[in-house]
C-alpha cells in the first residue's frame, strides 16, 4: 500500500513538473509585443529604433577574435590596430570562410537591415509621436540601413540588395537565395538612400551632445563621400583581378574598365561635406 501511495505521489509530482515546464515557455504577459502593439506606443517605437542602432560597431570590438573582427578594405585609412587579433589570424593563415569574423558581420548586418526596413514601414503607425518626430526617426533608420549596406560592401564587395520589404519569416528557400548586385548598383543604392535622408529635412544638421551617436546630416554626407572614395579606388574601379566574380547568369559584378569620373564625384562629395561640416563647427585635426 505504501509503495502504491509512493507511486501515486511520484506520478502527481511529474505531472506538476510537466505543467510547470509548459507554463515556463509560455509568453510572459506584458513583455512580448507584436508589431501593432510595438508601434502603437511612442516609447516602444523609440526602443525599436534604438535596437536598430545597436548593430553599429566600433573598432575596439576587434579586440576579441570571436567578435566581428576588423579586416576592412580601407587599410590606408584605419590601418592595423595592435589589439586586432584578426590581423594576426589573417597573416598566419588561420583566417578562412568559416571564421566567425567572416560570417558574423554578414548575418548581423542583414538582421539590422531587416529591422530598419520593418521600422521604416511601420513607424507612421505611431500616432503617439508627432509627425516631425516620426519623420526624424524614419530618416535615421534609412541612414542606418544605408550604413549597414556600406559596411557589407566594404567587407564583402558586391552584395545582395534586399529592397524596401524585409524578407518574411516564413519565406521559402528560393525567396531567401538572392543574387548579388553589382558594385555600381550597390553604390548607387546606398548613395541614393543617404541623399534621401539628407534631403528629407527631418534629420538634425549636427546631432550634438544631447543626441550623440544619432544619424545626422553631417554623418550622412561624410559617409556618402567615403562611399564614393571606395567606388573610385582601384579596388572597385576597373579591378581586372575580380573579372571572374560573376553571378550564375554571367552578370559582371566588378566594373572592368576604370571610370575616372568617379574620382571627380568623390572629390566633389568631400568638398560638399567639408564645406557643410565647417559651417557646423567641425574642423580638421591639427597635428603639430
What are these regions (language model features)?
Residues 153-154, 160, 230-239:
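Short coil/turn linking the two alpha-helices of tandem helical-hairpin repeats
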Residues 221-227:
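TPR/Sel1-like alpha-solenoid repeat signature
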Residues 46-60, 64, 81-156, 174-212:
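Conserved, well-structured interaction surfaces
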Residues 63-79, 162-165, 202-219, 235-288:
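Short, surface-exposed recognition loops and adjoining beta-strand edges that mediate ligand/DNA contacts
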Residues 21-70, 246, 287-288:
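Membrane-proximal, proline-rich intrinsically disordered regions
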Residues 171-185, 258-262, 267:
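Structural transition elements
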Residues 1-30:
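Bacterial Sec-dependent N-terminal signal peptides
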